[in-house]
Amino acid sequence: MNIVPILLIRFYQSFISPLLGPSCKYHPTCSNYAIEAFRQHNFFYASWLTVWRVLRCNPFSKGGYDPVPPKSVKSAGNSKDSK
């Protein structure tokens, strides 16, 4: 798990976000989205997802429900039918 980025985001949620007020147009909020991304994906992909989400959270976006994409499931065996 990516504990350091999650702790930094929790710090932001506890001490900085209350001063700024609610402003995220998405559900889950951008900071909760980032925490989920770091829980589900590696550091680099989670960082990319977080940056892309924050860039999309702007006055010109509609917002709405935008969950973290799930980890892709790779097939464990041969996909051909054996006969």
Curated annotation (Swiss-Prot):
It holds the Pfam family YidD. NCBIfam families: membrane protein insertion efficiency factor YidD. GO terms for cellular component: plasma membrane. It comes from the Bacteria. It is a peripheral membrane protein. Could be involved in insertion of integral membrane proteins into the membrane. It comes from Chlorobaculum tepidum (strain ATCC 49652 / DSM 12025 / NBRC 103806 / TLS) (Chlorobium tepidum). Keywords: Cell inner membrane, Cell membrane, Membrane. Residues 62-83 are annotated as: Disordered. The keyword Membrane applies. InterPro entries: Membr_insert_effic_factor_YidD (IPR002696). It is found in: Cell inner membrane. This is Putative membrane protein insertion efficiency factor. The lineage of its organism: Bacteria, Pseudomonadati, Chlorobiota, Chlorobiia, Chlorobiales. Its main location: membrane. Belongs to the UPF0161 family.
